[in-house]
Amino acid sequence: SEGGQDFWL
């Protein structure tokens, strides 16, 4: 979300 890398979590 904030980092833009919460799509693989």
Swiss-Prot record:
It comes from the Eukaryota. It is found in: Secreted. One of its GO terms (molecular function) is hormone activity. Keywords: Hormone, Secreted. One of its GO terms (cellular component) is extracellular region. The keyword Secreted applies. Belongs to the gastrin/cholecystokinin family. May control digestion processes in crustaceans. This is Gastrin/cholecystokinin-like peptide D1.
